[in-house]
Every structure is written in C-alpha cells, then in structure tokens.
Amino acid sequence: MTMLLEEIVQSVELWLKLIKKPQPYVDPNLDPVLLVPGIAGSIMNAVDDENGTEERVWVRILGADYKFRTKLWSRFDPSTGKTVSLDPKARIVVPEGRYGLEAIDALDPDMVIGQECVYYFHDMIVEFTKWGFQEGKTLFGFGYDFRQSNRLQETLDRLAEKLEAVYNAAGGKKINIITHSMGGLLVKCFMCLHTDVFEKYVKNWIAIAAPFQGAPGYITSTFLNGMSFVDGWEQNFFISKWSMHQLLIECPSVYELMACLDFHWEHIPLLEMWRQRLDGDGNSQIILESYPLAESVEIFKEALSSNTVNYNGEDLPLPFNMEILKWANETRKIISRAKVPPQVKFYNIYGINLETPHSVCYGNEEIPVTDLRQLRYFQPNYVCVDGDGTVPAESAKADGLNAAARVGVPGEHRGILCEHHVFRILKCWLKADHDPFYNPLNDYVILPTAFEMEKHKDKGVEVTSLKEEWEIISQDQDHDHDDKVAADERPMVSSISVSDVGAEACATVTVHPQNEGKQHVELNALSVSVDA
C-alpha cells in the first residue's frame, strides 16, 4: 500500500517537472577522499620526447599488444631503482584529468560496448557522488606508473604534492585515503618514509584487498609462465600473456608482491614440481619436490636463464633479475617498520570466501618436469586457501599496523570495489550521511524501537492517508503580468489513481494560481487495502 502512495508522489513530481533535471547533491561537510589504485590500475600514456605527441598505451584496443611491447617494455636501472622504457624516446606519464580520477575510473574511456570490463574505481566514484562528494572538491584520484617500485622517490614526491593539493582544495580539511591492492603497499611505504607529511594531511587510511604479505600463488606463476597478477584482465586488455610476462619480469613492483619470507604463514607457500630422478641403484623414479620461498628463487633463476625479448630485431636477455630482488627485499624491510601516526585511523577491508592460489605445482606423475626452462609451457596447478581469488585473506589482514577495524567481505579482488557491502562500510567510516545504527563489523542495522506511521485498520481493511505540498518558484523575473492574469483564476484540480490486487490508491492534486512568482501545489492521497 505504501508503494502505491509512493508511485502517486513520484507521478506528481514528474508532472511538475521537479525532478526532471536534478542538481547533483553536494555535501559541503564531507572530508576529502583520495583514491589510490593497485597494479595495472592507472591509465598510462607515452609521450614522444622528439615531437611531443602523446598516446595511450595502457589500456587501448587498436594495436594494443604492439604499443605495449614498444612503449612499456622496460629494463631496471639498479643505480636509480627505476625501470626505464626500452624506447629511449618514450616517456611514460599518467593523465591528471578530472583531478586525477580520469586515470583510475574506466581504464579505456574509448571502449563503448563492454566498458564495464575495464572499470576500476568507476562504480565507487559514481556511488560517492550520490553521497555528496564532488570531483575536485572532496573527491580525487592518484594514478601512477605501476611498473615502478612502491618506494620510488619520484612517485612518493608526486604523492606528497597530491596530498598537499587535495588538502588545499578542500579548504584545509584532512584527507581520507582509500587504497586498493598494491596501492596499500605504496601508501604504507609513504607513511614510513614521509611520516611528517602523512600525519599533516591524512585523517584516515582505508586499505582494500591489500597484499600486505604478498600474493604467493599468482606471483610465482607470473614469474614462471606469464600469468598476470590481475587474473583475467589480459583478455580484456588485448595484451598477450607472454607480452605481459616480459614486462612484469623487469617491474620492481611485482617483485615487491612476492610472499614475505619472515611472515609466519599458517601454511608456508611452496613451489612444487614432479621431477624424474635416479635412485641409489640408478633406477628412474618420479618424485614430488617442494621448494619453500627462499629455495624457489633458484628455480626462478634457472627457469628464466635463457629468457629473451626481441626488441627492434635484437634479442635482449631477460632473466630473473637478482638486482630487483635485492631492491624489493629492502622495500619489504621498510614496509615492516611502518607505524600509523597517533592522530590517523587505519581501517582494513579484505576479501574472503574465494579459492585463492597459495602454493603452485607443475607437472604430474605422467608428465614430469624434465627441463626447468620449459616451465612456461606447463599449466600451473594451485593449492588454494581462503581469500579474494588473488590475495590470500591471511596476507591481506596481516597489515602489521594498529587498526581501528578489520573487516572481511566476501568478494573478488577487483570486484570488491563495487560490492555494496563495501559501500555500506565506507559510508559509515567516511561519515557520509551514514546510519548511526549501522555496525560495519557485523554488517547489521539495529532499528530504533519507536516507529511512527498513521494507520487505520478495521476488519481486514487498512486505510492510509498522505498529504504533501510543494512550492514552485518561477525563474521568470516578470511576475506582475502573470499575477494579474491569475488574479481571477481558480485553482486547478486533477485526480490520480493507482491500483493493485487487493489495494487501491487515489489522490487529488490542487494547483493554485501563481502569486508573486510562487505557485503552491497540494497533494492529498488516500489508499485502501484489503487483507487477502
């Protein structure tokens, strides 16, 4: 019955054109939010330093794999800690449009059909604007070159500048940072290395699906047979699996996502292989060999010892990079020392209830691994644990920080960014017109005991009445003529009715003549329902 009355009210509002062109809702009391993506989550453009032309190289449809190989393939420079594009003329930049949101919204803005497959923060941005956040005032984004180390000074300097800019744009309000995936490692590095800046500008940090202790299963398979860290995105991004592998093998960020050696795993992540060996009597036998984290590095080295990439007709060696591993190990030491400043609150949301790769096994008893350099052609088999399908929950919730709250949410690694459960939690923590009775730790809403609604019910018949009024203010500045014309007019009366099985609602709408630029509208509605 209430629904029938709502339909009547909406019909009248549409008729009066009160909601034909709604103005975006803006809440001036909200604190600013900065969204920080994870690996592969930023649009990247290549600038030709010779002629100044700029083109998108991640993500694109036409010529995607070719541009990816010619512009994004890179080599690590241990003297600077930076990975540099093989093309000496190409300079990789991240677009700053829409206050940084352009780079992290839809990763291919030109894709019209099926664009949702390359959405990143899109759904969250749409949801936030409904809550009253405004781009450039209280909503911002920070895209970055995800190939680089999470402690690259160039990236950290950009983040410091961004925080200051957001702080100033919001009128001196402190910032809520929301990170996804590897973005959590970037912010944790920044918090450790630039504690004073972090404390000055940040109010809350909310990490979502962050691989704080690594993503063992996916990173192992990334090194050995080219599976992308973000499972399933390759086919959407039109990049071959091996082209992605040849990029990631020189990316410090990927090495920084390896499983942490000093973390006390419930089950140690293993690299396992079925191998053909000779016993003491010289007889051949097939055995399962297991390598813990430290020992698996030797397997990576041997498996990638002959790996090359052909660039401009020249074969360049691309082995497992021990220099990057050293750099990544130092990054992990820095991250482990991070502490949340006393005035900042930290929250952690992590994905659960999905099979998530943890240990990886190659070969089987019928087809053992005979040559490690052929591992790229083997299909990995995973031993899975609970998580978001990419990051184990054990890793994501082990942030090592003083957290105000940690909440596990059923969801997939990327899809968790559009989960309404997550939106409810964020709305509460951001104080965006949140329900004071909502508890994000158990996702329950406790309703107040008092509930006021006028009803009359007798012998199975329920009657509900409704009265609503509007006042329309004309945009026309010349009201005198209209007032004279309307002086002798009578109010216009119309009726509306809506019916359903066992229920009926009717209403009378009275539109009074305009007076001094204002027009008064009254709605009186009555609904009657009969118990079935």
Regions found by a protein language model. Give the residues of each.
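Conserved serine/cysteine hydrolase catalytic core
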Residues: 326-385
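N-terminal non-catalytic accessory region
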Residues: 1-299, 311, 355, 377-383, ...
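Short linear interaction motifs
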Residues: 12-18, 325-332
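Mobile cap/lid helix-loop segments that gate and shape the active-site cleft of serine hydrolases
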Residues: 309-330
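A broad, low-specificity signal for short, low-complexity segments enriched in glycine/proline
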Residues: 305-312, 368
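Extended, loop-rich substrate-binding clefts of extracytoplasmic carbohydrate-active enzymes
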Residues: 298, 304-305
